Amino acid sequence: MSTMAERDSDVSEPSRSRPRLGLRRGRGGGGRGRGGRGGGGGDKGGRPPIGLLPLIVIAIALVATGIGAIIVSTSYDTPREAKVLGPNLAINDGASNPLDLSANNSPALVRNPREAGNLVVANRIDSPAYSCSLHVSFDGGGRWTQTPIPAPRGEEPKCFAPDAVFGSDGTLYVSYVTLKGRANAPNAVWLSRSPDGGKTLSAPVRTPLGAKAFQVRLTADPTAAKRIYLTYLKADELGLYTFSNTGNPIMAVRSDDGGTNWTDATRVSGPSRQRVVAPSPAIGKGSELNVLYLDLGDDVLDYGGGHRGRGGAPYDGRWQLVLARSTDRGATWRESVVDDAVVPTERFIVFTPPFPSLAVDRDSGTAYAAFQDGRDGDADVRLWSLRSGAGEWSEPVRVNDTRTGDGTAQYLPKLAVAPNGRLDVVYYDRRADRTNVLNEVSLQASFDEGKTFLPRVRLSDRAFSSRIGFGVERDLADLGSRLGLLSTDDRAYAIWTDTRNGSVRTAKQDIARSVVGFNDPPRLSSASETALRVGGALLILLGIGTLVLALARRRAAARKAA
């Protein structure tokens, strides 16, 4: 905060000498001057008249008060900052074991609303065999232990696509898919519960989703302790790297008793949408269920497996980003198009697409959507927002602070909203590698509802290759479908798939984490700041005007006395 030194000013009156006129004063006092008794009026003509000095004091006080108001308005301009707290930490047990070649990816990160230090991460493992992993911390992410996920009886031991969420009563729910056969097709979706923050899991219960339920996601209503939702893509026939038919819908089911009983499935995506993928659910301010997904339009390259599972140039058409919303707990749905001109930036296997991210500010009701987009010539992170009660989504905001069209990719964003309204975005970032291969992980934060963002904070303390993972031999290395992010008023907890301990040969992937701390100094409201600055300026002008008036009166009095 700046300081102001006060200066004491002496306002002195220059002495004025009037020439004597040579009149001699008689005894009777007839020679009195006009200024009063004893002929002293000639000397008094240069003194300030009564009321002049108070005007000068008032003028100085007004100017000083105005300057003080402006200083107060600027004293709250301390810049907000974000800083990484400590080194990266691997979450999975086998990260430091060179014999453990597990490909861990697609992490989900959740927090117990009843115990702030209780964090849980669920992730899938693609190789050397399909499986799932659950990691639990009770000290805010400092130490992690692994909890075994129980295998359902009668199913092949191939767990896939786990997800996790805490209910408002602190119950942890974990969903996962079991795969079947040489094609590794989804056979069933299961749900386990934990009453102790993830230390133990109950025997799994089969959900009604059935076989060929892809891209399953789990969410919970924070206002109803046992209300949970599952969203998924209901597929028909499968082929190699493809759904054999179009028209596979996105569906949703609800349980109001923690997964014991379920509603009938309802269709989320409209019947005219023939190629939809990657449903991402989130609960809104009024407990409405929101589902963000991609409509691939005519993209048969990815949806139809036209690339035959090999990397190369992305689809050259456009996708739509769509939000479906239900205000009656999933019974009926209304859609809004977030953006109808999303430019694809990569190829993908349709069974495991990159997911867009959705977050809702439960205080303001604003919904935020994020995804990568190539309209500027390379992959950039874009953000869209929909204010509560608004009919249309905002124009996209480019989040990453790289030079436009620099040829590097920023992609797979994950959003989170802190209780104080701060919006955080974490994403993979190749800005430091002109060959566009090595990843870093970056986080950017917005304090004005996504209009502007702080400069990026690098979370990963080492760059790592984006070409390590399952599918690398086909130039389609899979780092997973998402990153994980949690936000509190003064922290952000981020997790991602990290390949620094792997190689093209081993395909080893680990789950790494980082913590970011924020300083959020007290701020004046924009109205208060404007009032102080405008009011201060007016006081300064008024003080200057008063001083000018005082000086003018002094000069006038001096001329009159002369």
Please place each PLM-identified region on the residue numbering.
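Terminal targeting segments of Actinobacterial cell-envelope proteins
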Residues: S2-I50, R555-A562
